[in-house]
Curated annotation (Swiss-Prot):
Lineage: Bacteria, Bacillati, Bacillota, Bacilli, Bacillales
Protein name: Uncharacterized membrane protein YnxB
Membrane topology: Multi-pass membrane protein
GO cellular component, one term: plasma membrane
Key words of the record: Cell membrane, Membrane, Transmembrane, Transmembrane helix
Subcellular compartments: Cell membrane
Domain of life, source organism: Bacteria
Segments crossing the lipid bilayer: 3-23, 30-50, 68-88
Length: 96
C-alpha cells in the first residue's frame, strides 16, 4: 500500500507539470494560475505514505491531497485521485 501511495503522488506531480507544459491547463481552466497545486498535492500524497503508521493523519492527508489536486489541475488529476480513493478504501478495510 505504501508503494501505491508513492506511485500515486509521483503520478499526480508528473501529470500536473506535464499538463502545464503541454498547455492542457491554463489560467482560464482552473482557479487562476494554480497548476502547481497538482504538484503540491502529489508531494502531500508522498508525505502521507510516510504517515502510514499514524492512521487518522494518513487518511486526512490523502483526502486533502485529492481535493487540492482536483482544484489545481481539474480532470488531469482524476487518475491519482482514483488511486487515493482506492488506498483510503483499502486502508479503512485493514483498520477494521
Amino acid at each position: 500500500m505504501k508503494k501505491l501511495t508513492i506511485f500515486s503522488g509521483g503520478l499526480g506531480a508528473v501529470f500536473s507539470v506535464l499538463a502545464q507544459l503541454f498547455a492542457v491547463i491554463d489560467d482560464s481552466y482552473t482557479l487562476g494560475n494554480l497548476w502547481f497545486l497538482g504538484a503540491l498535492a502529489g508531494i502531500i500524497t508522498m508525505l502521507a505514505s510516510i504517515q502510514t503508521n499514524n492512521k487518522p493523519v494518513f487518511s486526512i492527508l490523502l483526502i486533502a491531497s485529492s481535493v487540492i489536486g482536483l482544484l489545481g489541475t481539474g480532470l488531469v488529476y482524476i487518475i491519482p485521485t482514483l488511486f487515493n480513493i482506492i488506498i483510503i478504501y483499502k486502508f479503512s478495510k485493514v483498520s477494521q
